[in-house]
Amino acid sequence: MAPRLCIISAAARRLFTKPRPRAGDLAAAGAVRFYSKDSEGSWFRSLFVHKVDPRKDAHSTLLSKKETSNLYKIQFHNVKPECLDAYNSLTEAVLPKLHLDEDYPCSLVGNWNTWYGEQDQAVHLWRFSGGYPALMDCMNKLKNNKEYLEFRKERSKMLLSRRNQLLLEFSFWNEPQPRAGPNIYELRTYKLKPGTMIEWGNNWARAIKYRQENQEAVGGFFSQIGELYVVHHLWAYKDLQSREETRNAAWRKRGWDENVYYTVPLVRHMESRIMIPLKISPLQ
């Protein structure tokens, strides 16, 4: 049987052929307690109940950076297998223009294809400098951008599904900066038990020092809109062997095992993606 081909419309071909920017231009919480009339039974049960300290502020206020008002959007696009190359070409033709246009308060942080994990998937990370007002300003302007609307129409024909989240960055991580390649990237996603985000952040604020010797720490984020109590840690490595050696080295450092001991019970589900950057990605 002949392989399926991704049919590219004339409109999409026009987008491909428009001038592209040069590569150099892209450069926590709740508390749970059980009480009983039987004081002895209550005391005994309290030994086994995981307590989380009550907080007076939202975890987004306590954990995010105070000196910036950056908001991030992460997009996951599941692409028809026969359309992945065309999807990448279309993306590389259009998205850099938004990144470079100063009229749009948004910038590309990274663009990847998933190598190990969900196949035929693209992941995009955007930064909105100015928080929610910047996001809304950008969205309103895009409604009147004919080229972007044409791009979305063509892109929709290539997708099986898509989803996104709005994120804030942890205060103890460095802000993601463009980096030269070649690198592979690992996106480790943790779905936490509700009410444990503060505890997660406190432990990682102490533990991040064990994971910075090879400059592998790129960024750390937690969800605000979309699926909640989700954490994303983004790492960069030269290759898979470097990843293994770097992670093994962390286990030889006193204190890293303690972080794992205290954070593992907070996790409901975790996932790892190994990703390859697209040509337009500022993170190479």
From Swiss-Prot:
SUPFAM superfamilies: Dimeric alpha+beta barrel (SSF54909). A motif (SIFI-degron) lies at residues 2-15. GO terms for biological process: mitophagy; sensory perception of pain. Its main location: mitochondrion. Keywords: Acetylation, Autophagy, Mitochondrion, Phosphoprotein, Transit peptide, Ubl conjugation. Interacts with CALCOCO2/NDP52, NBR1, SQSTM1/p62, TAX1BP1 and WDFY3/ALFY. Interacts with ATG8 family proteins (MAP1LC3A, MAP1LC3B, MAP1LC3C, GABARAP, GABARAPL1 and GABARAPL2). This is Protein NipSnap homolog 1.
